[in-house]
Amino acid sequence: MPHPLFDKHRATLDAAVKAIHERTYWAAYAEMPSPKVYGETAMDDGKRAFDRCLGQQFALDQPGQTAWMSSEQSPYGFALEISYPVCKGQALIDAGLQAMPGWQKIGAEGRTGICLEILERLNKRSFELAHAVMMTSGQGWMMAFQAGAPHAQDRALEAVAYAWREQSFV
């Protein structure tokens, strides 16, 4: 079933599937935090976005929430004071089961397109993710950027490409 997000990201998916088929290296997401790639203000924008999370609730619209939990301490010596929702596991499972018919209805192209759009949006927030990884793991800046953003995004893309390839056989 055609889907606009699948069409939007088709070139990226095709390149990833080609790399899988040829068993070659290919990366969609730049591992160097270059302003030429990510934008001149990406570093400062990402830091500000991360800083806005400090001392706040990490609000997620999900069912079964019973409380907020906040006990994270940065390895760099300060309390992050970011609160995360605590949910009843069964409520989350039930919501997933309820969503399943919609995911089935949009077909493999729809599911793949949505996953690729998620990766594109995450990539645009790579500097924010890098600051979060750095401040929660203790990794240095470059490692936090590469491991927490483009490398993770490339591995996710690889998984999406494998899933698409297998579903396309059906």
Model-derived features: where do they sit?
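Long amphipathic alpha-helix in the N-terminal Rossmann-like dinucleotide-binding domain
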Residues: 90, 94, 112-127, 139-170
